[in-house]
Curated annotation (Swiss-Prot):
Organism phylogeny: Eukaryota, Metazoa, Chordata, Craniata, Vertebrata
Organism, scientific name: Cervus elaphus (Red deer)
Residues with the N-acetylalanine modification: A2
Residues bearing the modification N6-acetyllysine: K121, K135
Positions of modified residues (N6-succinyllysine): K4, K10, K90, K121, K135
Residues annotated to bind Zn(2+): H62, H70, H79, D82
Keyword Amino-acid biosynthesis: no
Lipid modification (S-palmitoyl cysteine), residues: C7
Gene designation: SOD1
Name of the protein: Superoxide dismutase [Cu-Zn]
Length: 152
């Protein structure tokens, strides 16, 4: 069973980063840094597939094995892959420090082999009042992505 994973984020533009995952008890600690962003919040999600053959679009929808509506990371009703937002400072750097109890590095909620995506816009956490909000949080375009792999 994997206890650590890593993801290198890359896209067509300047956005890039490295994200690390570590299983700690019943949670996964997600840490790292993303550069090249515009200042403010950006949706941050695990997507269904580890397929980046057509850029980030081939990663599919948010990882959602429980067939729930989109929500925030603290919500009961959420996709497994819904990790909310990362916030970039005025220099375009987002420091990631998330503890999540729904994603896993093993079992049916395993994110290993799936794609991590950082989005153009803020995730409205399913509270946007339209159908797209309940699917994607209106986070819009995928700026950078990478497949999550087992790490030492």
């Amino acid at each position: 069973m994997a206890t650590k994973a890593v993801c290198v984020l890359k896209g067509d533009g300047p956005v890039q980063g490295t994200i690390r995952f570590e299983a700690k008890g019943h949670t996964v600690v997600v840490t790292g840094s993303i550069t090249g962003l515009t200042e403010g919040d950006h949706g941050f999600h695990v997507h269904q597939f580890g397929d980046n053959t057509q850029g980030c679009t081939s990663a599919g929808p948010h990882f959602n094995p429980l067939s729930k509506k989109h929500g925030g990371p603290k919500d009961e009703e959420r996709h497994v892959g819904d990790l909310g937002n990362v916030t970039a400072d005025k220099n375009g750097v987002a420091k990631v420090d998330i503890v999540d109890s729904l994603i896993s590095l093993s079992g049916e909620h395993s994110i290993i082999g799936r794609t991590m995506v950082v989005h153009e816009k803020p995730d409205d956490l399913g509270r946007g009042g339209n159908e797209e909000s309940t699917k994607t949080g209106n986070a819009r375009n995928r700026l950078a992505c990478g497949v999550i792999g087992i790490a030492q």
